[in-house]
């Protein structure tokens, strides 16, 4: 949530009220396992989002509501928009987590299934570990050294928000959610704008065009030279 304070300020200056929240296991939300990106059930993400929006909507009578969601948030928002009654008029999905990058998909999915079968879902996926500050010169998130340096400083001062790599169970649950998207997306009835980063390395965009076409009312926009964090990128 802290990462988006600049963006929230920009919207506020344009006359919008802004609701930000951390998904469970991220930011200041409670960790299921310390440091690890872990989850019990994917539907908990969606239920959490629905409850937060429902309670906020009950307090304030807004004539119009919009969603701007990034990465994992975009995947969760897609399920929310498809499965819940809401008053959202339009949505923007930035670098949507509609694909898990895998060098060897068949092998990797077998490994994930095996780890789950042997009760090892709580372990970090291979190659991942505890939180490390972002490398300002070699990272796949953003070209903006200023913003990445600021985020490193925020993390350095607030150990409670540190988040390491994902667990096998987290990847397993997200993979299942992504595989079900062809049945979920057609139920999203509002207009959707999808922002795709040209230099994307964090999520897999291989099927993004096909998935975008499944939305009843959607258009996509390629952001030139942008890395994954489109909304946290270098100013032009």
Question: PLM features: what roles do these ranges have?
Answer:
Residues 201-207:
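Conserved alpha/beta-hydrolase "acid-adjacent" motif
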Residues 165-184:
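Active-site nucleophile elbow and catalytic-triad environment of alpha/beta-hydrolase enzymes
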Residues 226-236:
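Catalytic histidine-centered segment of alpha/beta-hydrolase-like enzymes
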Residues 39-57:
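Alpha/beta-hydrolase active-site loop
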Residues 60-71:
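Alpha/beta-hydrolase fold nucleophile elbow
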Residues 188, 194-196, 200:
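Short beta-strand/loop motif that positions the catalytic acidic residue
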Residues 8-34:
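Conserved alpha/beta-hydrolase
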């Amino acid at each position: 949530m802290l990462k988006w304070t600049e963006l929230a300020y920009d919207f506020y200056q344009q006359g919008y009220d802004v609701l930000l929240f951390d998904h469970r296991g991220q930011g200041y939300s409670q960790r299921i396992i310390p440091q690890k990106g872990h989850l019990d059930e994917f539907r908990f993400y969606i239920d959490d989002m629905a409850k937060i929006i429902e309670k906020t909507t009950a307090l304030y009578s807004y004539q119009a509501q919009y969603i701007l969601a990034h990465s994992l948030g975009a995947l969760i928002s897609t399920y929310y928009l498809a499965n819940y009654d809401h008053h959202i008029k339009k949505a923007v999905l930035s670098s949507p987590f509609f694909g898990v990058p895998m060098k060897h998909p068949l092998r990797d999915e077998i490994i994930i299934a095996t780890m789950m079968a042997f009760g090892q879902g709580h372990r970090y996926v291979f190659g991942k570990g505890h939180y490390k500050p972002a490398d300002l010169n070699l990272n796949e998130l953003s070209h903006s050294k200023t913003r990445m340096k600021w985020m490193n400083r925020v993390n350095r001062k607030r150990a409670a928000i540190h988040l390491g790599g994902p667990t096998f169970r987290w990847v397993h649950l997200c993979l299942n959610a992504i595989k079900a998207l062809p049945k979920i997306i057609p139920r999203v009835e509002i207009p959707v704008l999808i922002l795709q980063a040209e230099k994307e390395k964090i999520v897999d965009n291989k099927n993004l065009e096909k998935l975008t076409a499944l939305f009843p009312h959607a258009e996509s926009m390629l952001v030139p030279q942008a890395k994954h964090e489109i909304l946290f990128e270098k100013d032009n």
